[in-house]
Amino acid sequence: MNILVVNDDGYQAEGLAILVKALAPFGNVYVSAPKTHQSAKSHAITIKNRIETFVSVPIFGSTATLVVDGTPSDAVRLGLKVFDIDFDLVVSGINYGANIAKDIMYSGTVAAAFEAKILGVDAIAMSAPNTNLPYLYDETIKLFDELIETKLYEYDGILNINFPKETYQRPKGVKITTQGLRLQHAEFVKSEKPDIFHIKGSIINYQEHPESDVVAFDDGYVSITPLKLDRTDYSKIKDILETEN
C-alpha cells in the first residue's frame, strides 16, 4: 500500500512525525509537506508564483520526503506528481488543533484531503487539540487498523477525523458524526502600532445536534465525519422548484 502524508503545520511538525510512524506498518509512506506553517490557508493554491521544492532526507522513517514552499494543497499536487507512483491513500495531519464544525472552511488540513480527492485519490484528514497527547500514537494506529481493514475511506468524499478535547486521558470510543454548527465571532483589533490589526475570536454557542462532531469532541470521543465536495443545497432547490410550480 502506498500512502502519501501531507499537513499544514510544516514538515517539522510533531503531528506529522506521529502520523508517519503510525502509518509505517501499513505500507510505503511518502511525505510531501509545506516548508513553513500554513494553518488557515484553506484550499489556496499557488498560481502566479513559482514553487520551490526540495527532496529531503526521508524524515520520520518515511520512504521519501518532499518539502514544498507552498500551501497544503500545493504539497498534495506536487507530491503526487514528483513521486509519480500510484497512491492508495492520502492522509493529511495530524493537525495541531481540532478541525470541527466551521473550522473545516478554513482548514488547510481538510482542504489538502479534498485536493487529493479531486485528483482521484482517497483521502483522510486527521486533527487533534494537541499533538503532545500521550495516547496519540497508539490511538492513531488503532484507528488505521480499522479504517484500512474496512476501507471506510473508499467513497466519493473524504473522512474528517478529530480526537477529543485534551481533558480526556484517552478517547472513550469512536463516533460517526455530522458537521457541527459551532461558529466564532471574529473581529479585527487594532494593535499598539498604527495601521496594524490582529484577529480576535470568541465562540458562539449553538444548540448542537447530539450526533455532531462538536458534541463528540466535547464528550471525549473520536469523531469521524464523512464530507463531500458537492456543496449543493438540494433541499433548497426542491423548495424553489415547488414554489415555482
Predicted regions and their residues:
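A cross-family phosphate/adenosyl-ligand binding-site feature
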Residues: 3, 14-86
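Short, glycine-rich nucleotide/cofactor-binding loops
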Residues: 5-12, 103-104
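Short acidic, Gly/Ser-rich segments with clustered Asp/Glu that frequently serve as metal-coordination loops
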Residues: 9-17, 194, 207
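Alpha-helix C-terminal capping segments
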Residues: 79-84, 113-122
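Short, Asp-centered acidic motifs that coordinate Mg2+ and/or phosphate
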Residues: 89
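Glycine/threonine-rich flexible loop motifs
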Residues: 98-107
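Glycine-rich phosphate/pyrophosphate-binding loops
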Residues: 117-137
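Electrostatically charged, flexible surface regions
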Residues: 137-245
